[in-house]
Amino acid sequence: QNHNEAMKQCNNDYNKTAKEGELNENMAKYELLKQEGRAKRGTFHTVHGDIQTPVFMNVGTVGAIKGAVSTDDLKEIKCQVELSNTYHLHVRTGDKIIKELGGLHKFMVWDRPILTDSGGFQVFSLAGLRRIREEGVTFHSHIDGRKIFMGPEESMRIQSNLASTIAMAFDECPSSVADREYIEKSVARTTRWLVRCKKEMERLNSLPDTINKHQMLFGINQGGVYEDIRIKHADEISKLNLDGYAVGGLAVGCLLYT
C-alpha cells in the first residue's frame, strides 16, 4: 500500500503518452479497456503480439520452463508472455550465440512476447561477489567464478542480442534494510543508469544487424521502503517517456512486521 502513489504516477504518465498512440517502431500501444478505481483491464500491443493485462508471466530463466514444459505447452495453457533472465543467458548459453541463432524467439521456438530481466537483481544478490561503481558492477560468475562487468550499456547490448520484446533497465536493487542515505544515493544512480540505458537502446535499435529493431525499454522504480523517495523517483523517470515502467525492489528480502 505504501507504493500505490508511485505506481499510480508511473501509470498516469505512461497512459498519457501511450494509450492514444499508434503502434510504431518506437512505442507500443496500451489500450485501456476498463478501469474501476486503480484496477485496470487493458491490451498491450507489441511487435510479437498482444498482451491482455493484468497478466501472469511464465518464467523461463534460461530460455526454458522448468519441469519439461515445452513452448507448445505454454501455448496450450494460454501463456501470453514469457520471462527470461539476461544474466543467466549471458553466462550460460551466451547471448552472442543466441543472436547467431536468430534471437531468443527462434532459440526457444516461441513466437509470442518475451520480457528479459536486466540481470540487475541477480547481480546484486551476489553481495559478496560484486563491486558497485558509477560505470556499473563488477562481479564473479556463480558458474565458474570468472570476473564479469555489467553496466547499463552492457545490459542493453545483451538484451538486444537476445532480441526480446521488452528489455528491462539495468538498476540497483538495494537491500530492504539499507538506510535512507544509501537509498537516496542508489536511486540517483539508478536514474543516471536509466538515461544511459535509453540512449544505448535507441542506438542499438538503429543498427542494421539488430534482430528486433522494435525492442522496448521499461524503466524500474526504486526507493526501498521510503514512500516519498519512490514517489519522487516515479515522477523523475516518467519524464523519460519510456514504453513502460515497473515497480522494483519489492522482493529483495523485505522485512515482515507483526
Please describe what each predicted stretch is:
Residues 7-9:
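Short polybasic linear motifs
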Residues 19, 24-210:
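Non-catalytic, usually N-terminal nucleic-acid engagement modules in DNA/RNA processing proteins
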Residues 91, 175-177, 225-228, 252-254:
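Flexible loop/turn segments at secondary-structure boundaries
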Residues 161-162, 189-217, 222-252:
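Alpha/beta enzyme core
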Residues 257-258:
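Conserved small/polar residues in nucleotide/adenosyl-binding loops
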